[in-house]
From Swiss-Prot:
Function noted in UniProt: Is required not only for elongation of protein synthesis but also for the initiation of all mRNA translation through initiator tRNA(fMet) aminoacylation.
UniProtKB keywords: Aminoacyl-tRNA synthetase, ATP-binding, Cytoplasm, Ligase, Metal-binding, Nucleotide-binding, Protein biosynthesis, RNA-binding, tRNA-binding, Zinc
Protein name: Methionine--tRNA ligase
Family membership: Belongs to the class-I aminoacyl-tRNA synthetase family. MetG type 1 subfamily.
UniProt xrefs under Pfam families: Anticodon_3, tRNA-synt_1g, tRNA_bind
NCBIfam families: metG, metG_C_term, PRK00133.1
Assembly and interaction partners: Homodimer.
Cofactor(s) the record lists: Zn(2+)
Cofactor note: Binds 1 zinc ion per subunit.
Chemical reaction(s) catalysed: tRNA(Met) + L-methionine + ATP = L-methionyl-tRNA(Met) + AMP + diphosphate
Keyword Nucleus belongs to the record: no
Native source species: Chlorobium luteolum (strain DSM 273 / BCRC 81028 / 2530) (Pelodictyon luteolum)
Motif placement: 'KMSKS' region: 344-348
The organism's place on the tree of life at top rank: Bacteria
Length: 702
């Protein structure tokens, strides 16, 4: 493994089109902060970079719906999310914005360098143009009739009624959502990034990390690589975004695609931080020095943008250079999802707990601890109000808080607020805690991104401390053997100190309060010395005899009463009822039944069970898979708009339902001989209808 002298940590940029919720916190921002705080405690050089993703069509649509400017939208949510992060103790060194002038300059610099090298491909294509509005229309700005189900409210990217993924040109009677005029097809030039050019280099890069990257990261990435990497558009016709920095007429009215500009935010925000330090070139120390380790925290829905897209852009920049070479990520610890009361967080359906709202009711450290103990490292986990209440009351209040307060209050009342005894290493080791193993395991857990394990190890120290104090009974010993009671309290106070260090990355505000109650000025990070890991202080007692405590103690955690949780549970019950009713078809809004047909008409539809024998991606069509399906003794080719929901490997071997007598049609230059049936679940996720049973291939649906 490479030896690094410093660590650059980045976090996926939250989209400035809504507030962050607890799922975002659990998947990206809390684990990154825990890791960064641990590195700082070790006296290591570490930089924590984050910021807002502020471009793209959803933002312009929100602005138009509200009658405000895109700038107003991103200003609102950038401020809202930053305030929530700070209140939660997320310790960014810089939290930037992709709408900033410096970011625009950085992204344009990358574009121009790659354009100068001749890396981009230019491609003329036909897109809808609104002559009345004077602009080209992205897919979400076009509506019309779905060619599959006949819904008159289909959008240019998807029909919400039947779930079919579409292109604007497939709509019947298309209309502009801006002017309601019928758009016309016009030629427009766009720039494409040739991902396939870097496929071999990307494969080598990914394979070099097969022993240290998480399996989910490797699997997602290799699925894309196996399907072959296609050219990807990096420009689009839009008014809000980073302008294509070329003087030619074809570049007018075009901006950089948000996928290209957003991942460069990590670089521009580091440049911003450097300028704030008074050294404009300091950012190169973090991005272009091979002794710097780059660790990028993301959710699993962002994997390929950080394992393929950004590395490919940096590879293109580095091509042929002798200096100014960018580092690639050394690790991309993508988490799984944390669900909410058994269901996926969904902002569009308002099924979420938003971070800012949560922190108005409960302390940040109670949330940080609860999420750390449910960290979705290798599988989806679940946040529930009951679990949150139980962990706060049982583990934080009764175990940790109770021990700290008892130790400090008893020392203040019976020993004059001073550590009453010198603790020997033998006494420390006699507590029944293997300090060498504990310190090593704790360090390895934090370093290895195993944050649930780290929180558990630290809380186990608190449990052992409680058992020690309860069994020693210093309140009884003080009457007959004051010296024994003093030894007990000296050990207990040193345990308080150990806990303030072990738990600091997870619950920093609480540990700073413990630190101050122990008589220290400032917080735990005041103990940091360069290249001197504080965790090693766990190996022996740290508080000498006579060390003065604060005369005042605090209740670290108040218990959460049932009546505080009940409104939240009732709110969830209502949201679940609405979701279940929606799934069952009980909510009549949003449901449009098609016109009635006669039985004879229905009988004309030939639905049969088919088996997928082969599958591959369709070039230049990110939503389509080309499938070879067996129906009885015949084989057909079917194009299905499920590429964003199933990999080719996942489709092979499935039994599916095929509309077998649908007239063949050409899609993206390929013949499709039928249509497969799927249902749309929450968040637009498509699920194939998969018939069950033996020897059913070719059978008709009765």
């Amino acid at each position: 493994m490479a030896q690094f002298k410093r660590t650059l940590v980045t976090t996926a940029l939250p989209y400035a089109n809504g507030p962050v919720h607890l799922g975002h916190l659990a998947g990206v921002y809390l684990p990154a902060d825990i890791y960064v705080r641990h590195k700082r405690l070790k006296g290591e050089e570490v930089l924590h970079i984050g910021g807002s993703d502020e471009h793209g069509v959803p933002i312009t649509i929100t602005a138009e719906k509200e009658g405000i400017s895109p700038r107003d939208v991103v200003d609102r949510y950038h401020r809202m999310n930053l305030e929530a992060f700070l209140k939660c103790g997320i310790s960014f060194d810089c939290y930037g914005r992709t709408s900033s002038e410096l970011h625009h300059e950085t992204a344009q610099e990358f574009f121009l360098e790659l354009e100068r090298k001749g890396i981009f491909n230019r491609r003329t294509e036909k897109l809808f143009y609104d002559a009345e509005g004077g602009r080209f229309l992205s897919d979400r700005y076009v509506s019309g009739t779905c060619p599959i189900c006949g819904s008159t409210e289909a959008s240019g990217d998807q029909c919400e009624q039947c779930g079919t993924h579409l292109s604007p040109m497939e709509l019947i009677n298309p209309k502009s959502k801006i002017s309601n005029a019928t758009p016309e097809l016009r030629d427009t030039l766009h720039w494409y990034f040739p991902l396939g050019r870097y496929q071999a280099e990307l494969e080598r890069f990914v394979n070099s990390h097969e022993d240290d990257w998480r399996s989910n990261v490797l699997n997602y990435t290799r699925t894309w690589l196996k399907g072959g990497l296609n050219d990807r558009a990096i420009t689009r016709d839009l008014n809000w975004g980073i302008k294509v920095p070329l003087g030619e007429a074809e570049a007018v009215g075009k901006v950089l695609y948000v996928w290209f500009d957003a991942v460069l935010g990590y670089i521009s925000f580091t440049r911003q931080w450097a300028e704030e330090q008074g050294d404009r070139d300091l950012w190169r120390h973090w991005w272009q020095n091979p002794e710097t380790r780059l660790v990028q925290f993301i959710g699993k829905d962002n994997v390929v943008f950080h394992t393929l897209m950004l590395p490919a852009i940096l590879m293109a920049w580095n091509e042929g250079r002798e200096d100014g070479i960018y580092n690639l990520a050394d690790n991309v610890p993508a988490s799984e999802f944390m669900n909410f009361e058994g269901r996926k967080f969904s902002k569009s359906r308002n099924y979420a707990v938003y971070l800012g709202e949560f922190l108005q009711k409960f302390p940040a450290d109670t949330l940080r601890y609860s999420i750390a103990m449910n960290y979705p490292e290798n599988k989806d986990t679940d946040f529930s109000w009951t679990d949150f209440q139980n962990r706060t009351n049982g583990e934080l209040a009764d175990t940790l808080g109770n021990f700290i307060k008892r130790s400090i209050d008893f020392t203040n009342s019976r020993f004059g607020g001073e550590v009453p005894h010198s603790c020997t290493v033998q006494e420390w080791e006699g507590l029944g805690i293997d300090w060498y193993a504990t310190q090593s395991q704790l360090d390895q857990a934090y370093e290895g991104f195993h944050f649930r394990e780290a929180a558990t190890i630290a809380m186990d120290i608190a449990r052992a401390a409680n058992r020690f104090l309860t069994s020693a009974e210093p309140w009884k010993a003080i009457k007959t053997d004051p010296e024994a009671a003093g030894r007990t309290m000296a050990l207990s106070l040193n345990l308080c100190h150990a806990l303030s260090i072990a738990l600091y990355p997870v619950i920093p505000e609480t540990c700073d309060r413990i630190h101050r109650m122990l008589g220290f000025k400032g917080g735990v990070d005041g103990l940091v010395r360069k290249c001197e890991p504080i965790l090693k202080t766990l190996l022996e007692p740290a508080l000498p005899m006579g060390h003065k405590l604060s005369p005042e103690s605090e209740i670290l955690f108040r218990k959460i009463e049932d009546q505080e949780i009940q409104p939240e549970l009732q709110k969830i019950e209502q949201l679940v009822r609405e979701a279940e009713a929606r799934e069952a078809g009980a909510i009549e809004v949003k449901i449009e039944f098609k016109p009635a047909i006669g039985f004879d008409d229905f009988q004309k539809v030939d639905l049969r069970v088919a088996t997928v024998r082969a599958a591959e991606k369709v070039k230049k069509a990110s939503k389509l898979l080309k499938l070879q399906v067996q129906v009885g003794s015949t084989q057909r080719q079917v194009l299905a708009g499920v590429a964003e929901h199933y990999s080719p490997e996942e489709m092979v071997g499935k039994n599916v339902l095929l509309v077998a007598n649908l007239a063949p049609r050409t899609i993206r230059g390929e013949i499709s001989e039928g249509m497969l049936l799927a249902v749309e679940g929450e968040g637009g996720r498509l699920f194939m209808v998969e018939p069950q049973g033996e020897k059913i291939n070719g059978q008709s649906v009765q």
